[in-house]
Curated annotation (Swiss-Prot):
Cellular localisation: Membrane
One Pfam family recorded for the sequence: Spec3
Residue stretches spanning the membrane: 51-71, 87-107
Bilayer topology: Multi-pass membrane protein
Lineage, uppermost ranks: Eukaryota, Metazoa, Chordata, Craniata, Vertebrata
Alphabetized UniProt keyword annotations: Membrane, Phosphoprotein, Transmembrane, Transmembrane helix
Descriptive protein name: Protein stum homolog
InterPro entries in alphabetical order: SPEC3/Stum
More about this protein: Able to rescue the walking impairment phenotype when transfected in mutant flies lacking the stum protein (AC Q9W2E1).
Protein species of origin: Mus musculus
Keyword Membrane appears in the UniProt entry: yes
Similarity-based family: Belongs to the SPEC3 family. Stum subfamily.
Highest taxon of source: Eukaryota
C-alpha cells in the first residue's frame, strides 16, 4: 500500500506545480539542476597544476606519502590556482604543508598512505578538468 501513497504524493505535488505555473502545465518546461561539491579547506587548497606536474605529484605521493603534496604546496607559490580564491597565497601554502604533514604522520597506520594516494589522484583529476576548461572542450559525465 505504501507505493500508492507515494504516487498520490507525487501526483499532488505535480498538480500544485501545474497550478502555480501561470503558463499551465507543459511537458516541455525543464528544470536546471546545479550540483556543487562542498569542499573542506584542506581539500579546497589542492592546486590546479599542469597535467605532467600533477602526475609527478601522484607518483611521489604513491611511493613516499606526503612528498607530492609537499611539492604541490610550492606550486601555489608559483601561481597555481586553488578553490580558495579569498585566502592569501601563504595561507593556502601552509594548508598544503599541513596536509602533507598529516599524510606523513599517519602513514604509519596506512591511513596517511591511502590519503596521500587519493590526494594525488585528486591533483590529476583537477589537472584534467582544468585542461578541459582551458580548451573549451565539454566534459563527458
Amino acid at each position: 500500500m505504501e507505493p500508492l501513497h507515494k504516487d498520490a504524493e507525487t501526483a499532488a505535488a505535480a498538480a500544485a506545480v501545474a497550478a502555480a505555473d501561470p503558463r499551465g502545465a507543459s511537458s516541455s518546461s525543464g528544470v536546471v539542476v546545479q550540483v556543487r561539491e562542498k569542499k573542506g579547506p584542506l581539500r579546497a587548497a589542492i592546486p590546479y597544476m599542469p597535467f605532467p606536474v600533477a602526475v609527478i605529484c601522484l607518483f611521489l605521493n604513491t611511493f613516499v606519502p606526503g612528498l607530492g603534496t609537499f611539492v604541490s604546496a610550492f606550486t601555489v607559490l608559483c601561481g597555481a590556482r586553488t578553490d580558495l580564491p579569498d585566502r592569501h597565497v601563504c595561507c593556502v601554502f601552509w594548508l598544503n604543508i599541513a596536509a602533507a604533514l598529516i599524510q606523513v604522520l599517519t602513514a604509519i597506520v596506512m591511513v596517511g598512505w591511502i590519503m596521500s594516494i587519493f590526494w594525488g589522484m585528486d591533483m590529476v583529476i583537477l589537472a584534467i578538468s582544468q585542461g578541459y576548461k582551458d580548451q573549451g572542450i565539454p566534459q563527458q559525465l
